[in-house]
Amino acid sequence: GVKDYFKKLLQKVINKIKSFRKKQEA
């Protein structure tokens, strides 16, 4: 459904932000 789609999309964004922060810290 639409909710599942947005949940997956949100997780992708969160993962990108987390990986981006790790690169900034390094």
Swiss-Prot record:
GO terms for biological process: killing of cells of another organism. This is Oxyopinin-3b. Expressed by the venom gland. It comes from the Eukaryota. It is found in: Secreted. Disulfide bonds: none annotated. Keywords: Antimicrobial, Cytolysis, Secreted, Toxin. GO terms for cellular component: extracellular region. May have cytolytic and antimicrobial activity. Its main location: secreted. The keyword Nucleotide-binding does not apply. GO terms for molecular function: toxin activity. Signal peptide: none annotated.
